[in-house]
Amino acid sequence: MKYITQLEKKSNDTELPSIYCDLDQVLVAFMKGADAAVGGSFVQTDKDERWNKINQTRGFWANLEWMAGAKRLYNFIIRYDAYVLSAYTRKDPTSRNGKMKWLSKNTKFKKFNI
């Protein structure tokens, strides 16, 4: 694994490794949004209840906030044709489209790199 400072030292783009960045809790503050949606602690709320509340929160995925420091990370990695990784949940049928909307609204990742 390379440290981000090691990537800066590379002079030739062909020498760079692929960069993969997670979405939830790396770029996007999922837990903060989930806590707000359930009106308390997401992890301490009954599983069915918490997902029902998220399902009922219009635009939940598309309107999540950036994680602290995530814009700085994003601005660094986007220069290197980075990939974003994220899973969608079957507990919320809007999660996939919502995450794609968030990425489209807030980033310039190539569609192929998502």
Residue map of PLM features:
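Active-site neighborhood of HAD-like aspartate-dependent phosphohydrolases
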Residues: S11-G59
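Short glycine/proline-enriched coil/turn segments at helix->beta-strand junctions
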Residues: G40, I77-A82, T107-K110
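Substrate-recognition "cap/lid" segment bordering the active-site pocket of phosphatases
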Residues: L85-I114
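Short, acidic loop-to-helix structural element flanking the phosphoryl-transfer center
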Residues: D46, N55-V84, D92-N97
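Short, flexible, glycine/charge-rich loop motifs used to bind or transfer phosphoryl groups or to couple energy/partner
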Residues: K9-K10, R72-L73, I114
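Short acidic, low-complexity intrinsically disordered linear motifs used
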Residues: M1-N12
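Non-transmembrane alpha-helical segments in soluble domains
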Residues: M31, D35, Y74, M100-S104
